């Protein structure tokens, strides 16, 4: 097979490909065997029409479409490798010519990754934040744990005060009509928590258990439900009970109840260790981000619109997946923010351009420094994934191969190695 490469304007390349006659004849024969299965001609059984008769009746072109599908996709991939290019979009295939006993030819125009002009990417002397876990940090974690193990207890209190937990039934109306989400029974509300519409909780202070009261509020103009925003509402509220929160003492008994440790000091040590690890991770990520930002800024590259759109697609898919975990559709979420997909993409275009440029720069650095990913590193990563998911590595690898995601995993490992390289050569000791 012969391949000629021509650089076009921008980041486009044209490949002119010539496929050897033997391969062409084999493809035409395969195409014939496929087409003839559905052909009926008087004098021949269905599927048994000779090729010369088939071509005489319908023309030789009857086999060309299937021969194209057999020949061109693999030939294009071989041409890409031979030309040593990295396409970033689907090719435009033109000028396909095929005839028996002759070479087949076609042209493919495709957008490729642009050249990256690297700037300084070593010796930048970037500082990593110092990590310190204070007593206040530990106390905050203990307080959070304490809150989680607190319980609401019934009380004989009659009058609602700030900080009380009240059990209420309520029904809300707007212009005398009930509205969706405006009523509930046996609802636990912490007075003063700001959970409800502004003004609602304050009007409960001083009210008595068993008392039915009316609460008048106005929904904020920026309220999430647009049909309620800015409207006046009246809630009929039945105060059924006042509860108080019982918070456990911070002692060894609490440590035993709330953790796997026997003493409060052991629990504190564990909290300190976990907080230190979390802060170290954050400091490392911040350092990595600063280094990647700097080396990206120092590089020159024209980022193709195709890569920006690909990045936006990925960001949008991630957003949709994240929102779905809350039982929402991404369209509804964007609508609540006053956006649609088009306006969201416009708002995030600058970030997508930045990410696309960073990816190109990291790949260029990795290539220049000869950074490669070994089969052993891929297997180790698969074992790590399998361990986290309590599955067998063989199952994970088979799934990745089936989904065509093995190359994606390899690229993820590659990028991680490049970032580790950059940290090693840019962090101040």
UniProtKB/Swiss-Prot annotation:
Involved in protein export. Acts as a chaperone by maintaining the newly synthesized protein in an open conformation. Functions as a peptidyl-prolyl cis-trans isomerase. Its main location: cytoplasm. GO terms for biological process: 'de novo' cotranslational protein folding; cell division; chaperone-mediated protein folding; protein transport; protein unfolding. InterPro entries: PPIase_dom_sf, PPIase_FKBP_dom, Trig_fac, Trigger_fac_C, Trigger_fac_C_sf, Trigger_fac_ribosome-bd_bac, Trigger_fac_ribosome-bd_sf, Trigger_fact/SurA_dom_sf. Belongs to the FKBP-type PPIase family. Tig subfamily. The keyword Transport does not apply. Consists of 3 domains; the N-terminus binds the ribosome, the middle domain has PPIase activity, while the C-terminus has intrinsic chaperone activity on its own. It is found in: Cytoplasm. Transmembrane segments: none annotated. The keyword DNA-binding does not apply. This is Trigger factor. GO terms for cellular component: cytoplasm.
């Amino acid at each position: 097979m012969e391949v000629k490469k021509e650089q076009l304007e921008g980041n486009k390349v044209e490949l002119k490909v010539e496929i050897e006659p033997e391969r062409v004849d084999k493809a035409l024969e395969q195409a014939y065997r496929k087409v003839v299965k559905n052909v009926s001609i008087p004098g021949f059984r269905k599927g048994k029409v000779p090729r010369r008769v088939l071509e005489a009746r319908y023309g030789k072109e009857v086999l060309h479409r299937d021969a194209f599908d057999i020949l061109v996709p693999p030939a294009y991939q071989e041409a890409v490798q031979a030309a040593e290019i990295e396409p970033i979009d689907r090719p435009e295939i033109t000028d396909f010519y095929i005839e028996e006993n002759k070479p087949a030819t076609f042209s493919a125009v495709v957008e490729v990754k642009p050249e990256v002009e690297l700037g300084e990417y070593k010796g930048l002397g970037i500082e990593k934040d110092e990590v310190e876990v204070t007593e206040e940090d530990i106390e905050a974690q203990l307080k959070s744990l304490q809150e989680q193990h607190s319980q609401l207890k019934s009380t004989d209190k009659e009058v609602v005060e700030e900080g009380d937990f009240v059990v209420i039934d309520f029904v809300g109306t707007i212009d005398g009509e009930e509205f969706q989400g405006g009523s509930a029974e046996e609802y636990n509300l912490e007075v003063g928590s700001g959970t409800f519409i502004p003004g609602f909780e304050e009007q409960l202070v001083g009210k008595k258990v068993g008392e039915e009261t009316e609460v008048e509020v106005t929904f904020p103009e920026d309220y999430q439900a647009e049909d309620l925003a800015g409207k006046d509402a009246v809630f009929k509220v039945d105060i059924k009970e006042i509860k108080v929160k019982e918070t456990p003492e911070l002692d060894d008994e609490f440590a035993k109840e709330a953790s796997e440790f026997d003493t409060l000091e052991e629990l504190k040590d564990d909290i300190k260790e976990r907080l230190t690890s979390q802060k170290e991770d954050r400091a490392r990520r911040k350092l990595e981000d600063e280094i990647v930002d700097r080396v990206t800024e120092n590089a020159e590259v024209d980022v193709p619109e195709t890569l920006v759109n690909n990045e936006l697609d990925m960001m949008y898919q991630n957003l949709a997946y994240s929102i779905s975990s809350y039982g929402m559709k991404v369209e509804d979420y964007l609508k609540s923010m006053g956006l649609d997909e088009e306006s969201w993409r416009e708002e995030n275009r600058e970030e997508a351009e930045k990410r696309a440029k960073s990816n190109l720069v990291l790949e260029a650095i990795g290539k220049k420094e000869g950074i490669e990913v070994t089969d052993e590193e891929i297997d180790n990563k698969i074992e790590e994934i399998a361990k986290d998911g309590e599955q067998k590595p063989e199952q994970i690898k088979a799934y990745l191969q089936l989904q065509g995601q093995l190359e994606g995993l390899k690229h993820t490992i590659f990028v991680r190695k490049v970032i580790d390289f950059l940290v090693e050569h840019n962090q101040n000791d």
